[in-house]
Amino acid sequence: PGILGEGTSANFVDGQWLGTLLSIEREDGYWIKVSGETVELEVEGLPTDPNTEYSLHSGSNLVSYPFAGHAPIDETIPVYAQEAIIGIMGEGTSAMLTEDGWLGGLLELSGTEGYWFITDEAVDFTYNPPTDGMARMVSPVRDVPSEFSYRQSTQQAFYFVENATI
């Protein structure tokens, strides 16, 4: 197993953690790599302060979402911060900000996920808390039929097509 952070990682080898990732930071996002069957993960710690300020630099930023449940991107990220964000990538899903709003398969941020925010300028922001009902809801995980099973790669690409003739 291993943990990937923004510009850092650690792998569990022969009973010890090896790598440059020495601690887990609340405001940072992480991807946990496991091989084989489904793994149950126990996480210990205190909830992240919902007023945590996130400082994004220009480029790719791997960040957390501090709330339980989920909330729509356009509601939870303040408008001024959205203007600096080109796109957001999650595990196997993404969204891109256009003149018409957010497009793509990623519509909501979830407290159990880490996200790559791609920005064209530095911006500091605090998430807007989800509305009362959304904080307690969890998006269902879609089951994939076994004949279409796959392993999620940490190397992914997304394409947004404006026009297509079929």
Language-model region placement:
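N-terminal exported-region signature
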Residues: 1-166
